[in-house]
Amino acid sequence: MAEHDDGDLIAAIRGLARANVLVVGDLMLDRYAYGRVERISPEAPVPILTVTREIAMPGGAGNVVRNLTALDAAAAFVSVVGDDQEGSDLTALIGGQPNVEPWLLVETGRATTVKTRYIAAGQHLIRADRELVMPLTDKLGERLLKIASDAMAATSVTVLSDYRKGVLAPTIARNLIASARSIGRTVIVDPKGADWSHYAEADVITPNRRELAEAVGRDLPDEAAIVGAAREVIGRFGFGAVLCTRSEDGMSLVTVDTVRHYPAEAAEVYDVSGAGDTVVAVLAAGLASGLPLEIAARLSNIAGGLVVGKVGTAVARPDDLVDAVKPASGALRKVVTRQAAAEAAERWRQRGWRIGFTNGCFDLLHPGHVHLLEQARAGCDRLVVGLNADSSVRRLKGATRPVQPEAARAAVLASLASVDLVVIFEEDTPLDLLSAIRPDVLVKGADYTHDTVVGAREVESWGGRVMLAELLPGHSTTATVTRLRS
């Protein structure tokens, strides 16, 4: 496959859904508390965060699994949680992931690792960790090894995601690698610590620059130093390849006789949380779907660049990767999926921007539509337009509508300067889309009343408001269609 062939790369991305990957490693609960800072505490010179929203998601090895499912790949997941509420929360969160076969063992007396990040205006204020690092009991370790070794038979790639919380003790890591090699399975290790001897014979190891420097005991100031260090650990531990992530400098893939440097793909960096997990997941899915190592590494580099441009522990989806390889041109860049719109809204929110939302069929765009959209945009910093899909319009307007198909309606809307994003939705109402975007301002025409605006109660529940825009008399899509037919 030629690296420059966009068509082949897009086919490779679509093929990631064929992957079936085993993930073994440390699972933790990632919590995010978002809010605003408006004053300093009178008790100490520290900011007061007024929390407005909290979310929780699987972290550590669980984030590798999240990224695999975001690619539509299948995953078997083996890990350990404590017998506490956080462990129960993680079990539910992992159980809610599609295409995952979870094997979460519960250990009495173990405290589930929890990392809580406090964020305001897109900036991390502090991270609070609660953890008790301890090895597994011999009995539980043997059980984990048996389950993981059995799961290897149904998967083609095994990922060891080591955060040094006790699941991947040296003996367990060695035995898992030996089991995988005995049946011809590829092993990827995301390492931790300075001693990598228990990762010996892994096919690919994925350190960042700091971790590789720690393993060889010296600074790595440039590409030549990174290549030298990578070949040193390849020679010492028998690795097939080292994929070193280098932050703003991209990634380097090193084998005994080849070197490839991939430049950084990120346009803007908002949050590096979990980016390494994304790289590992895409690499694993690529290899599991039959891609050459060089192409899988290239896709993982693209994916890493995407997630650092998002807020929080984010994932890269196939459509994201396709757009990065072959971006839409012109106004069509504004036509996005619900998930992409929600992620954009979160970035805008962290910058303190007010998000506006309106929706409709916008079948034959007329001056009345333009007037409403301009008022909506004047009442916010960024405007998202929900556009009824063709099926939704037919249910609402009848079998003869829409006149224009959804792709054409979306393209015309996206060409307007007042519109920042367009999202097509299949439902009869935009409630689900509203809940995903959580706008500050919900805009409808003045022919509505507050009580008849769908989503008014929901928007006001999170502190938003409803705006009724004045209408421009004499303009109606229905009237235009009637005139055309007569």
Swiss-Prot record:
GO cellular component: cytosol
Disulfide bonds: none
Entry superkingdom: Bacteria
Start and end residues of each stretch annotated as Ribokinase: 1-331
Keywords: ATP-binding, Carbohydrate metabolism, Kinase, Multifunctional enzyme, Nucleotide-binding, Nucleotidyltransferase, Transferase
Region (Cytidylyltransferase): 357-486
Molecular functions per Gene Ontology: ATP binding; heptose 7-phosphate kinase activity; heptose-1-phosphate adenylyltransferase activity; phosphotransferase activity, alcohol group as acceptor
One Pfam family in the UniProt entry: PfkB
Record note on quaternary structure: Homodimer.
Protein name: Bifunctional protein HldE
The species this protein was found in: Acidiphilium cryptum (strain JF-5)
